């Protein structure tokens, strides 16, 4: 037990040095992490993101100090990093932060999402094992472990993803519950009457229960590994164990005092000095955590050597190295669409059809709207075909998005998902977290404006684009036709470290001769030009056709007009100033159009003499889409009035 107590003492020391932290779980869940790392987790100490490593997600991210001491004693985190817990150190941040070269498998903190990401990882292990079984069944035989707290299980998303794990029988997913019966403001029984055994068995899980003794946790994990279902292990722990706030809500977060160290030393019969521990502790963890990995890592290396000449090996390398250039470059032909002058969502179907082959590692998740959004590859699904690229998640948008993050974190697959734009709110917490981790997830949101029409204001998403565009590292594309759609799809497929969001229409839009897929990648470009224009009209998506209609009307009034298509306003604003000055003339007036509440358009005002913007700033109504659209001011007559005011 001395080595476990050393971990707990180091956690106390680091939290005290940081002037406070989540002591409760750091001590209570420590036996869970200790058991996992010293007896079960397989990984490659020299390759943190080894593709066949066991994954560990701290869904209850505030319990990070149950993990960091183990990594320190194993030689994977330095003493300096422990001394700077919470202050400028990615590897010992307050909540775990994923990085390409560290031993953290997911950034966590927003409760519930870690469980969803773990489900995504286990799901990816399942589909990759099936895809490469013919090459070797040992290529993807790892487990996914996730540590959850009571808060994780109270979040609604935990129900969404746990249900799906049961549906898909993800038997290599093992959840360990830090069940201490206490949370920050209350005891659990004050806010939850749930029987966890009933909950998880009803969802198709294996349920186990154990004490926090290392031997008991170890036995439960061994039993879970033999299950043909995902396993939920409820580990009965004690919050802030062996401190003055043991078993109390106040033990969730506090600054350890000398009395806490005295209580800890007395109860554990130890007398450690903060940040100074016997060499025997380091030796133990090196043997049990590091040296234990040599045999499985070497066996995997030898396996790959034997497979190098096999037909599937190149595909295996392209997938596991996330070589999107090899998989998707030059795969799309913008000219090959079933029908021109169509809704942009229809073009997505055309382009996905072009890459629907065995070499593609794209997997499509859909929230029960595949037929409406065209987010699908072929007509089968994972239930009927283990090699299918279509994963049904039901009406679980938030869960779907956390699973997408987990799949991207696992690696080996490209993942696309989406629904109607009005329901992007359900996914935003996961989009934000994925962007924070630089994950190349790909979202498609359709039914993008007032022109949804008869479904009414609940389905008319005037307010969604500004929220998506406000998230750092998210590229939002709103194309006006098939060429711009092809550019957005291609960019999203090739992206290595950015989240991409493609915004598509339900209503048909004209195919434009002047549009350009190459220029689209600049975020904006001149689609109809007049030198020294009197008026410049810039627009995105469905408003580009309106801008071109306005151009005709202005030409009749002898006003020289330039039209700029802006499929990605944030990307346009990131271009060099010299490029923006080519598009926008300082002697011209500028009208910008978008059926959205986005504010980014006002950043273009400094490049022109005068500017006004027509956006969408109120709920719509249940009516014909074009009627609603025009009622909100998106008609040539109203735009001419705006231009007249601008020119006055």
Curated annotation (Swiss-Prot):
Disulfides per UniProt: none
> Which positions bind substrate?
22, 252, 345, 372, 447, 455, 506
Record's keyword annotation contains Isomerase: no
What Enzyme Commission number(s) does the record list for this chain? 2.2.1.1
Q: Which domain of life is it from?
A: Bacteria
Q: Which family does it belong to?
A: Belongs to the transketolase family.
Protein's recorded name:
Transketolase
Please report the organism this UniProt entry assigns to the protein. Mycoplasma pneumoniae (strain ATCC 29342 / M129 / Subtype 1)
